[in-house]
């Protein structure tokens, strides 16, 4: 009687295919990613991610909603500020963005203001009791961050802000300006 392996040689390669592949002995690390500046690395990760973005830090919130070094009266204010501050959502232009012309400490007082409905009707916002100068940036053309063109509109009004709890300072802080309601 002859053994089966010699009589039928083709099952041997099939049996070898059924063996489990060897397990890798280490974790995969992309060392090139860790050579980048941490802020650049976080920006790339957020830009390429498919899930929700991480909440901005207090420093980033202050940068996004308060005036920069450039004067308000510049006709191209929104285009330059929104590009230099990199204000976008995963590379896409915001249709509208407000920037307050007061220090952030003054804007924090808006979280103690009157509760009003936000523009989108979903959230509960707070309206400041103090008139402030601000800029409304309205998207004119473009969809991607590199080709956004904004119209700059100077305003004086009551900022309508959404507020979030800050664990460090233990107070509510404004995180987004939804509107600037005009005085009556």
Swiss-Prot record:
GO cellular component, one term: extracellular region
Signal peptide: 1-25
Keywords recorded for this protein, A-Z: Disulfide bond, Glycoprotein, Secreted, Signal
Residues bearing glycans: 147, 179
One Pfam family recorded for the sequence: RnaseA
Protein's job: Does not exhibit any ribonuclease activity.
Compartment list: Secreted
Family indicated by similarity: Belongs to the pancreatic ribonuclease family.
Principal place of residence: secreted
Gene3D superfamilies reported in the protein's UniProt record: Ribonuclease A-like domain (3.10.130.10)
PANTHER family: INACTIVE RIBONUCLEASE-LIKE PROTEIN 9, RIBONUCLEASE
Species the sequence originates in: Mus musculus (Mouse)
CDD domains tied to this protein: RNase_A
Cystine bridges: 93-148, 111-163, 118-125
Identification of the protein by name: Inactive ribonuclease-like protein 9
Nucleus in keyword set: no
